[in-house]
Amino acid sequence: APLEYRGPFKSIPTKIPGVHFSEQFKESAKIADKITICRSMSHGEAAHERGTHNMFTGYRPSPALAYPSIGSVVSHDFGSRANLPPYVCIPKVPNEFAGSGYLSSSYGPFGLGGDPAKGDFKVKDLTLPNGITEDRFNKRRSLLNTVDDHFRQMEKSDALSSMDNFYNDAYSLISSKEAREAFDMKKESDKTKERYGKNEAGQRMLLSRRLVESGVRFVSMTY
């Protein structure tokens, strides 16, 4: 394409014959045969908000129906594994269309509440609060179960079921060493972090890889 259309950067060949990337993606070009290039994504919306809805749900916006995000559909259909949330957003839930829509809110995304690109990165509520021992934690959980059993006998609702699932997932995260390690960026060497790039995009992608390898089924990353 002419310079005025393509910009100042040239294209370079990749590992896939006939496929070219921008010269800014030299390392990606070397492994192009190991990634999937999505060419089918398009939409006819003029507004960014409506286009974002399409991206996250696969549907055009409807005034009559709140569609679930693709991550929530995956969460609903496949569930969790390895005590990890099935659907995680890095670093946080990016917009209202990333939610569970008409599905139960228990299939909504798990937001980190922190940025893996920052040195003090910590996932919210993944460890016990200061001053709370494991014994005290277990007693609180037992008391909560007693109260919940009482309410379940009196009333059934999506809100109560979702809270049950929320607490159970939280307990699994806190009590699982493997789950905590999946979010622990300190497990990665400086060399690996350098290869991904010590910036927002690189470190968020690195954490995404860790989570998928550990058992998270769907990761949505924003940078």
List each language-model region with its residue ranges:
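Ligand-binding pockets and gating/stacking loops
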Residues: 1-223
